[in-house]
């Protein structure tokens, strides 16, 4: 669902092109919002115009004036600001020590499990994909991918290791959670988190944070913003591939054991 529908296409496309000149992913994201909401603003400003101008509104007023608004803001404000931010972020990443990278990786990995597809999850993902697209650094992309894969894998492992603590209906989702986890689809754990939020989220955040931190400790880099285990063949080195899997396995096992232990036996 778009913000402004068809009239927002041209200013949105221009915002994306201008962002590619240095403002990067986040600059393009903000430019898209500016394009969409500028059309909405123009619609409100012209709503009292005579109906005979309706054709001109959609053909001339909305696309041209929204393009002017978006272009001016992108050229004079968004572009320069986010170009500078991208330079700062690139320098910061290049000078970041291992300890700081591990800490940030753990935070990002943990955030992926806090709300499993919600705004906190999306904030961590947006930061990492922004760094990935603007600096070609896939380190934090590996952290969020590992962290996001842990919850469904942990649930599936808990059902495997603690069979007496899950009823038959819950056990039916074991295979699907394995598949979703390996595919980096965190939302597979949501039904369990909805039933027992503190136990599920608490246990998953621990393992996801550990997985995210370990990817940074071992210098893992992801070659794509999504894909789970399917990105492994494209990883830059065998080292990254091996320790990406090891990081996820450690995090999932820790979370799965914690959840299985604290859940207790199911009620009959």
Where are the regions that the model predicts?
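Pore-lining transmembrane helices
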Residues: 1-51, 58-266
């Amino acid at each position: 669902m778009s913000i402004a529908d068809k009239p927002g296409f041209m200013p949105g496309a221009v915002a994306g092109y201008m962002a590619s000149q240095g403002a990067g992913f986040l600059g393009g994201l903000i430019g898209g919002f500016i394009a969409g909401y500028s059309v909405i603003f123009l619609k409100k400003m012209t709503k009292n115009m005579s109906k005979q101008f309706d054709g001109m509104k959609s053909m001339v007023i909305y696309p041209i004036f929204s393009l002017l608004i978006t272009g001016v803001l992108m050229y004079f404000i968004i572009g320069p600001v986010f170009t500078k931010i991208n330079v700062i972020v690139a320098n910061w990443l290049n000078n970041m020590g291992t300890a700081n990278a591990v800490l940030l990786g753990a935070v990002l990995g943990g955030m992926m499990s806090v709300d499993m597809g919600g705004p906190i999850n999306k904030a961590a993902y947006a930061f990492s994909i922004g760094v990935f697209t603007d600096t070609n650094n896939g380190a934090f992309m590996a952290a969020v991918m590992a962290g996001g894969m842990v919850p469904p894998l942990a649930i599936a492992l808990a059902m495997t290791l603690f069979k007496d603590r899950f009823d038959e209906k819950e056990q039916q989702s074991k295979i699907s959670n394995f598949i979703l986890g390996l595919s980096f689809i965190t939302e597979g754990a949501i039904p369990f988190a909805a039933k027992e939020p503190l136990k599920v989220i608490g246990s998953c955040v621990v393992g996801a944070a550990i997985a995210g931190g370990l990817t940074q400790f071992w210098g893992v880099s992801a070659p794509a913003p999504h894909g789970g285990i399917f990105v492994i063949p494209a990883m830059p080195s065998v080292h990254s591939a091996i320790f990406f899997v090891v990081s996820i396995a450690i995090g999932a096992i820790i979370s799965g054991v914690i959840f299985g232990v604290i859940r207790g036996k199911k009620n009959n």
